[in-house]
């Protein structure tokens, strides 16, 4: 067996990775880590801040001396014996064992975690639980003031007779033990040695035992000095000075990777996990990254075997290609894994295995082996599957039976197809494809947009589901259904939640870890409220579902575009799209409706207006015909917001009801199709970024039925509305002026009017929303291509 080795140190130090901020947390400045403090188990003189007659500084000094003495007098083996004698975990690094043992001997044994009954442990900043809440998640409970057992520490014989025994016995009496006070201001760099270089306030170049090197930008610009190279060779992180100032400001060491200064100078490349990069830098990497695995038959690009016409090995109906995900917030894990058997011409068979973190290839565990025979290759593949998942391979592949195990990977069930980030048109292909397209030019340009990689890359990047190592836009319906079931189950649990405090937080944490294992994200976080569930779970799942369907419709356009792939995809839509004449009455009516009901989208202090680029009429076989819809009662022409990445699915399958019911806009009416009489509301969905000003708004004819229910607040239960399929109108803070409304052709109402304040100023809705529960009562009629433009912008034409 020939082995090609590549990189690679396994990158996980058990529970030692730095905490990072998610995109959501950075964007909204939600620094809301919740720390819960059980009833204090210490005696404190509140007047002078002393515990048991000793000041906090005295306790710190005494503990430092105690640690120095035990380090000198106790061996690591003796410390393990002490931990085992007190029924505590004796595994881990030397530092973890020592810190765990010294905390036990000096301050006393900790009580079990109040959430999961696991063991609590000091991590240098706070006490965190090391137990598991479920097979999907570690317990994430932490506190600065944990309760301790009111009992003496058990000392093994080897320690009883040691020179340090008298010192240890001094702290045996629980009533006389010092109390650790972590509520006071903590020095952010406790336990770290920091070296400085360059034009900083201080210079210190002794690297012995250094945790990191803080260097000036000038050192980076010079391409790396010998001193800087020395630090890199020793594996010492080199960071910008901002790391120091930010850590001091936030009173906690910030993740070193986010302040990296020079790792891109190393031979292996930058190697910073995406979830530890600044969101702006991560976005740039994401958009320029090449998808490495496009689906169940895709050969992982890092193998280079696709260049030799390599194919995924198939036997007895099984494709030997698996992808996995694991997100564990308690252990700071967010990993993917890929394993494949690849056949190249002349029957050469290779086993490929890779496990790591997105963006950190230099630290990934990776192997590519040429196999001597098929049977041995299959045995090794099956062994690896069972090792990383704890499940049998064939039970998964043939029956999709799988039981998640703690800290084990879960399969991402890839579908047999080509994900759009690979199969759709790249930037260089777009012009050629449109030139060769036989469709009407405006329609060809429209299809060019919907068949481009760009809109799908942006959508996945903005949702945080943009891993280049996993084809999240080419998963099976079964996988999507599992995600939906877990989401609905969690929402039901939260709505009837009786637990409070840490136990309620644990339920949210468990769901978050489960969710981001099933839906691998480059920026996982712990959900805290319904709005985050709506934005980052429900809407994201709907988006991934729509992108998956787009992947199947588009197929693989990565080859020649001479065969007119745009026309081929257009035919698959089962939909007729025709440009609307700009001098027609319908065109003028739609422009008027847009201008009357639009309010500028605000981004920071800048407002964006909108202009109409073109309008298309739509005849979709997935929607009721015009002849059928006009026979229905209470017909209204309404605006629907949609991302460009969702449009292929809408045109091919029609609108689908929302995936769940949540007490937030867009989901508060349950599993309904939601529209608005305000173009402003639809525009908020269609507008994604200032550097991508083009978008589409949908105009649909909706029949609200004979009975319309008006609601001023979210209904407690949407089940009856969903069952009766009645039309619902949610009353917003703003409405369109009813005196300006008019009736269009065939008794279709157009609520076109200036936006004015309503009498419902306490409504959770900004504008009126209309909910329809039966897709057969909604007909997509027009697509309005718009361009968002900065208001009052002055273009400088001076040279």
Swiss-Prot record:
Residues 71-105 form the SAP domain. Zn(2+) binds at residues 113, 116, 129, 139. GO terms for cellular component: nucleus. It is an enzyme of class 2 (transferase). The keyword Transmembrane helix does not apply. Residues 309-409 form the WGR domain. Keywords: ADP-ribosylation, DNA-binding, Glycosyltransferase, Metal-binding, NAD, Nucleotidyltransferase, Nucleus, Transferase, Zinc, Zinc-finger. Signal peptide: none annotated. It is found in: Nucleus. GO terms for molecular function: DNA binding; NAD+ poly-ADP-ribosyltransferase activity; NAD+-protein-aspartate ADP-ribosyltransferase activity; NAD+-protein-glutamate ADP-ribosyltransferase activity; nucleotidyltransferase activity; zinc ion binding. InterPro entries: ARTD/PARP, BRCT_dom, BRCT_dom_sf, PADR1_C_dom_sf, PARP1-like_PADR1_N, PARP1-like_PADR1_Zn_ribbon, Poly(ADP-ribose)pol_cat_dom, Poly(ADP-ribose)pol_reg_dom. It catalyses: L-aspartyl-[protein] + NAD(+) = 4-O-(ADP-D-ribosyl)-L-aspartyl-[protein] + nicotinamide; L-glutamyl-[protein] + NAD(+) = 5-O-(ADP-D-ribosyl)-L-glutamyl-[protein] + nicotinamide. Its main location: nucleus. Residues 1-55, 140-161 are annotated as: Disordered. It holds the Pfam family Zn_ribbon_PADR1. Its EC number is 2.4.2.-. The keyword Transcription does not apply. Belongs to the ARTD/PARP family. Involved in the base excision repair (BER) pathway, by catalyzing the poly(ADP-ribosyl)ation of a limited number of acceptor proteins involved in chromatin architecture and in DNA metabolism. This modification follows DNA damages and appears as an obligatory step in a detection/signaling pathway leading to the reparation of DNA strand breaks. This is Protein ADP-ribosyltransferase PARP3.
